[in-house]
Amino acid sequence: MSFKSQLLILAQKLSKGGISCELIEFDECILKLEWHTELLDKNDSLLYEQEEDDILSLMNPMITMHAWIRDSPSFEVPQFFFQPYANGSDPLTKMEQIFELLEGSSQNLAYDALAIGDCPGTVGIAWYIHPCRTRDYFEMLQIDKEDPKYLSLWLLYIHQVLSPLTQPIIKAVDDAEKS
């Protein structure tokens, strides 16, 4: 099954779960996603942070996520680019801001996996999970690109790195696969 076909199937699953999806084609196929997530603290109450010098102040705990999925030509694995926005329009561009949003276990993985750079789905920059870390994950799983659960399993890795920001996409895929 081609990567484009897998993206189309994934887009159907995500759309059913309320994730906005658009397949865009530049020189390659890219699935553009958008969703909103409400951050909760460890006591399941809304997360509000006090403003500090360079750390994010969440006046509104709603984070808007823009993401792009493509096939990395050099590493031959899916690649996940993302840009979170606080308060509807403030892009989070500092590593400290991203780490503040992640669960403790995700922070360790994110430290080794996250980078910021040119996003092939936009004319700007975005955060991304480096494809060499994704390749390591697939080597550990020993899963073939033709496996129908290839992208679903890959999303579990993305969720390990970016939890709780990616919870809505995990829920959408889980719900679609149960029905």
Curated annotation (Swiss-Prot):
Name of the featured protein: Ubiquitin-like-conjugating enzyme ATG10
Active site: C132 (glycyl thioester intermediate)
GO molecular function: Atg12 conjugating enzyme activity
Functional note: E2-like enzyme required for the cytoplasm to vacuole transport (Cvt), autophagy and nucleophagy. Acts as an E2-like enzyme that catalyzes the conjugation of ATG12 to ATG5. ATG12 conjugation to ATG5 is required for proper localization of ATG8 to the preautophagosomal structure (PAS). Likely serves as an ATG5-recognition molecule.
Membrane topology: Peripheral membrane protein
Entry similarity comment: Belongs to the ATG10 family.
EC number, as in UniProt: 2.3.2.-
Cysteine-cysteine disulfides: none
Domain of life the protein comes from: Eukaryota
A single GO BP: autophagosome assembly
InterPro entries, per database record: Atg3/Atg10 (IPR007135)
Organism: Schizosaccharomyces pombe (strain 972 / ATCC 24843) (Fission yeast)
The keyword Thylakoid appears for this protein: no
Subunit (UniProt): Forms homooligomers. Interacts with ATG7 and ATG12.
Keywords, ordered alphabetically: Autophagy, Cytoplasm, Membrane, Nucleus, Protein transport, Transferase, Transport, Ubl conjugation pathway
A single GO cellular-component term on record: nucleus
Gene for this chain: ATG10
Compartments reported by the entry: Cytoplasm; Nucleus; Preautophagosomal structure membrane
Keyword set includes Nucleus: yes
